[in-house]
Amino acid sequence: MEKENHGLSETEILQPIPDRLVVLTFDDGNKSDYTYVGPLLKRYGFGATFFITEGLNFLNNKAHYVTWEEIRQLHDEGFEIGNHTRHHTHANTQSKAELLADLIHIDERCEEHGIPVPETFGYPADCRGPEAIEALSEKGYRFARRGIGPEFPFHPEGGRGPVYDPDVHHPLVVPSAGVPGPNYGFEDLVWAVEQAKDGKIAVLTFHGVPAVEHPWVNVSPEQFETYMNYLRANACTVIALRDLAKYVDASETAGKSITYWP
């Protein structure tokens, strides 16, 4: 299996990180990724990463979760498909071999449907330990997105988190500046964007719009459109996680901070 290269060639240089650089990510393969989120982002010209797992009720409830054919269509529309593991198991409870097997399963499912092998990863429930970092490094992932902890207190219904500072954070523990849900509002989104300056990047972790099976991370379509309108009105550069490679050299990891949670 080979990963598609969305980075820079040896003759290219990294682009300067613009202020208001925002990364959009969506976890769990909710049906709204295909029916609502993807079409809206396409109209706005925004990039995004959709992290896919076959855990939760993905295999049994196609009213609330995307099909692999729909995932392929999201890829065809230019969005990134990232790896969220086979079973959505907390990575800090798995051995390296167990996590690698979960990662490879999603890789193979992507290949079966003509989707590039993922080069980015989203930690299920933000849980991570040393063996998870080792597994991702061994598999050649460029970037892995985590949640808001341990820097910010965990709230099951969303909240603020640290902005990503490439000079500080290891690329396999990219923090979320916000996890929208019932405990997260418009002022929190504005706060995240305002932190995205001086080389720092706001990474946002969404789930379903709406998240029918998981109301604790639900965002309504009306809320979501308000958020996206703000990003557009404020001339934000909105990208997928893989596109960080245009601005950040993921191979430079010496001295970068790695945090585990919980």
Indicate where each model-derived feature is located.
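C-terminal domain-boundary segment and adjacent tail
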Residues: E2-P16, A48-I52, F58, E111, ...
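Short acidic, Gly/Ser-rich segments with clustered Asp/Glu that frequently serve as metal-coordination loops
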Residues: G29-T35
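Short amphipathic alpha-helical segments and helix-helix/interface helices
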Residues: T35-G38, W68-R72, I133-S137, V190-V193, ...
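Non-membrane alpha-helical structural segments and their capping/turn regions in soluble enzymes
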Residues: K96-A101, F186, N218-P221, E225
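Hydrophobic "anchor" residues on beta-strands that sit immediately upstream
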Residues: V23-L24, E80
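DG-centered beta-turn motif at the end of beta-strands
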Residues: L24-G29, P182
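Metal-dependent polysaccharide deacetylase catalytic core of the NodB/CE4 family, i.e.
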Residues: K42-F143, G147-R160, P166-P175, G199-A211, ...
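A Trp-anchored, charged/polar loop motif used as the substrate-binding/catalytic surface
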Residues: P180-W191
